[in-house]
Regions:
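N-terminal accessory segment detector
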Residues: 1-104, 109-129, 136-164, 170-211
Length: 211
């Protein structure tokens, strides 16, 4: 179903409307959470938001993946693309940084935490929720991708007003470790043999690792 009224809007108006829709979604997420929090406490509210995010993050990732026409396993490049199109991508100041074979995603200014702080409410202990959210999203984009929390309340290494997550493909990291060990062994063999077998060792290292 398409809303014919949307077709009449300019690009700028559509961008404004997307921001409004995103804020509305986040407002709904917040009001039902606070309703449970007031009646049953923080632990009960966190339980229900975890259950919701387990399902929602997969749905969101699947639709974004289809929209971007990503292949089955698009790697960290595909994940980086998809992260920018999440609802939160329209709400929070965020950045993606590539560090070798890892992708760092950092929320600089989380609307949820800043709003709670502004209202005098305690910070939302969202690390457990974030683990389901980001792990599930990444695995839906590419089943090989793993996720590790770098900073998220209450386990913050950075500002509690944001969070940071590291994504990586486990096989590639294990392969790098194995390759590093093999190179180390080859260099050790080179030193041990000195000039006697040096050219052969160098040749083998170059052939094995494409140097």
């Amino acid at each position: 179903m398409r809303n014919e009224h949307l077709a009449k809007l300019t690009k700028e108006e559509l961008m404004d409307l997307i921001e409004i829709y995103s804020k509305n979604w986040l407002a709904h997420d917040g009001v039902w959470f606070q309703s449970i929090e007031r009646k049953h406490g923080m632990d009960e509210a966190v339980f229900h938001v975890e259950e919701a995010w387990k399902r929602f993050t997969v749905i969101e990732a699947m639709r974004i993946k289809e929209f971007l026409h990503l292949p089955e396993n698009p790697g960290l490049e595909g994940l980086e693309q998809a992260l920018h199109y999440r609802f939160y991508g329209n709400l929070n100041k965020h950045e993606c940084i590539r560090e070798g074979n890892k992708l760092i995603y950092r929320n600089r200014d989380c609307r949820v935490q800043t709003a709670r702080s502004r209202k005098g409410l305690p910070y939302h202990p969202c690390k457990s929720v974030g683990i389901y959210e980001y792990t599930g999203f990444a695995a839906t984009i590419d089943k090989r991708i793993k996720c590790r929390c770098l900073s998220c309340y209450p386990d913050c290494n950075e500002s509690p007003d944001g969070c940071a997550w590291e994504f990586f493909i486990e096989d590639s990291i294990q392969n790098q470790i194995q390759e590093a060990k093999l190179v180390q062994e080859g260099l050790a063999d080179l030193v041990e043999n000195k000039t006697n077998d040096g050219p052969t060792v160098i040749k083998n290292i170059r052939e094995n690792f494409g140097l």
